[in-house]
Regions:
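Adenine nucleotide-associated cytosolic modules
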Residues: 1-344
Length: 344
């Protein structure tokens, strides 16, 4: 082990003898008896194994037994990581520096003790395809790429319009070109090392940010590809459901539930699938909010095998000018042929 203080935790003194790691009480850990051994904290940079660290502490005047005790206390408190030297060595300097906040966040959020290495490795191995590359879709693509996902492709051959432009997505130079090409350039700006090629291979996850044609939904179900819906319009943002084919409510289940509540829903849906209001009531902030939450749900699935993000059998929704996202539950529908209802 190469002990390293968890990145993102600032050491602060509570008094002359008590050192606190982290500022917010929801993350912070305080240890007493640190006054005479505080020098060891500056050595927790991951450059030494435990034996080398104890030797270095002795050079700073900290007895070996005291140094070993402090390391044990810090490890038990969950503020140490085993420095992921192999991961760092395999990343170019700029990429490593850019992904440092991602690693720091993963280390604190999941507490795996490896500095976020295994989770980032999962992200770098993942392939996500985003259908739709307008305001929301292009932002999703860049957010995922910047978060460490190694392969992000967009599918949207339509020409980019001025209303598609957004700070984290398409730019003025993309106008008139296929939106998917503009999204690929946006990904390259955010994370040049990320692949945007799409050879038709099955992705690990599909994100649907526009109207979903029945043949696409059916193909995803047949191929057992997890897929997440994300939509913003009418001054409303909706993220979900996250469909795990055959295991959770699918898009058809949701539409059947809506039809149960409103018998005219199938007629409305058929029209909305092939037409839309212009301009869309999806301002820059709503698009970014929806894209950010959709990206978070996608990463929740990628980061943990067998994870059940909150959008499984549900949606997260915000209705402007409200600020609060609320969850709606969508159980599998008994009349849907997707088979999820039998898994419950």
């Amino acid at each position: 082990m190469r002990p390293k203080l968890k990145a993102g935790l600032l050491p602060v003194w509570r008094d002359r003898n008590t050192l606190q790691f982290g500022v917010d009480p929801r993350r912070a850990v305080a240890l007493r008896g640190m006054g005479e051994v505080a020098a060891i904290v500056s050595l927790l940079d991951g450059s030494r194994d435990q034996s080398g660290l104890i030797d270095a502490a002795q050079e700073q005047g900290v007895p070996a037994q005291a140094a070993s005790r402090v390391l044990g206390l810090l490890a038990a408190a969950g503020v140490l990581d085993d420095f992921p030297a192999a991961l760092h060595a395999g990343l170019p300097d700029l990429v490593r520096a850019r992904l440092a906040p991602e690693l720091a966040t993963l280390s604190l959020a999941y507490g795996d003790g490896d500095g976020g290495a295994r989770t980032l490795t999962r992200r770098r191995a993942a392939f996500v395809r985003v259908h739709g590359a307008g305001r929301t879709g292009a932002c999703v693509a860049t957010f995922l790429a910047a978060s460490g996902v190694g392969h992000v492709a967009c599918a949207d051959p339509g020409p980019a319009q001025p209303a598609d432009l957004a700070p984290a997505g398409l730019v003025e130079a993309d106008l008139g070109a296929p939106r998917q090409e503009g999204a690929a350039r946006a990904v390259a700006r955010a994370a040049p090392e990320v692949s945007t090629r799409d050879d038709g291979a099955l992705p690990d996850l599909v994100i649907l940010t526009g109207p979903v044609l029945p043949d696409l939904a059916g193909r995803l179900m047949r191929d057992r590809v997890p897929h997440l819906a994300a939509w913003a319009g009418e001054a409303i943002g909706v993220v979900g459901p996250l469909v795990r084919p055959g295991r959770s409510a699918c898009l058809g289940c949701v539409d059947r539930r809506k039809a149960d509540a409103d018998p005219q829903w199938p007629m409305i849906l058929a029209q909305a699938t092939f037409d839309r209001a212009e301009p869309q009531a999806c301002d820059t902030v709503l698009a970014a909010m929806t894209a950010a939450l959709a990206s978070a749900q996608a990463l929740a699935l990628i980061d943990r095998a067998g994870a059940e993000p909150v959008t499984v059998n549900g949606t997260l929704e915000v209705v402007l000018p409200d600020w609060q996202w609320r969850r709606r539950t969508w159980p599998p529908h008994p009349a849907c042929p997707c088979g999820a209802v039998t898994m419950r």
